[in-house]
Amino acid sequence: MRATINFIVSILIFITPVIAQTQPLDAFQQNKRLGRGVNILGYDPIWRSRDQARFKEKHFELLKKAGFNSVRINLHAFRHMDKDNNWTLSKNWFDTLDWAVEKATANGLAVILDLHEYNVMAQDPGGNKEKFLSFWRQVSEHYKNAPDSVFFEILNEPNKALTPKLWNQYFREALAIIREKNPTRIVIIGPAFWNSVDHLDELELPQDDRYIIVTVHYYKPMQFTHQGASWTNQRDKVGISWGTDAEKNAVRADFEKVNAWARKNNRPIFLGEFGAYDRAPMESRVRYTDFVARTAESFGWSWAYWQFDSDFILWDMKKDTWVEPILKALIPETK
């Protein structure tokens, strides 16, 4: 009898670590994994042709070496879907995305697949709903066996006609599709009104799904962060500085409000976008970037800077090098 008991105990000792290792990480653990991130590939010609890519394999390695933990891949996918074939995503599109996921993962970077079709969805939610749900049906099937370092973000910045009430309906339908094949994969969801910090109370998450990370975006004050941007009414307003005590206190107050919501609802927070347009004075860009990143980290949030290249620039493609002041603001040098 004693021999039998000893045998059973030895078996339990052996299998317990195996069972523990197979338990999925919870959303808070996974949020730590995201850590410090950056938005990539949204407007890169790589989606037209791999031969035209600005972002190369080496950039994944450079991001990791610089101290980043994750990438948020911005996917403008609707143009790559075949209307006459049930909105099927093209093989070339999936091949490109597979390459990016593979190279990011190989370099130890967590990956967020962010459906970035916010403008189209905002203009006509009903007319684009079929595409929206078809996208997640295909992507969730395609990546059902991907490592748990691959995250899904249902939609970037729902806004305008995609109201809080309608958004709560749409994301739940997409989430149900995802959960069919990805029951424990982390899904990132943010509030309507451009993932605004002021609209979290209108986000109605399913209480029984704890594999969700909540995202907010932060560009306040817009007159500073978007000065000189061609798509805004700030096109000709440049030279605006940032960094007074009052301005810092405003950021801190907004983040404290988000953190209070997060504690009340027991949800981790991912600051999915922040930054200042590259026509803002560099010293103020640095102050703003550093302050927002450090304040987010003080609350235990993960974050992703907007963005790697193009505007809000972190990497200068022409010079093939980092914009060092912004890099150091994001990833301070350890002493």
What are these regions (language model features)?
Residues 6-17:
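Bacterial N-terminal signal peptides
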Residues 20-72, 87-88, 261, 327-329:
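N-terminal carbohydrate-binding accessory modules
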Residues 24, 133-247, 252-276, 298-304:
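Active-site region of glycoside hydrolase catalytic domains
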Residues 40-57, 77-90, 223-250:
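Acidic/histidine-rich helix-loop elements
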Residues 46-51, 77-95, 116-131, 284, ...:
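Surface-exposed, active-site-proximal loop segments in enzymatic domains
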Residues 49-65, 132-136, 251-257, 288-293:
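Short, acidic/polar
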Residues 60-69, 88-117, 122-151, 167-181, ...:
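An active-site-proximal structural segment forming one wall of the substrate-binding cleft
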Residues 281-335:
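Aromatic-rich peripheral "rim/lid" segments of glycoside hydrolase catalytic domains that contact
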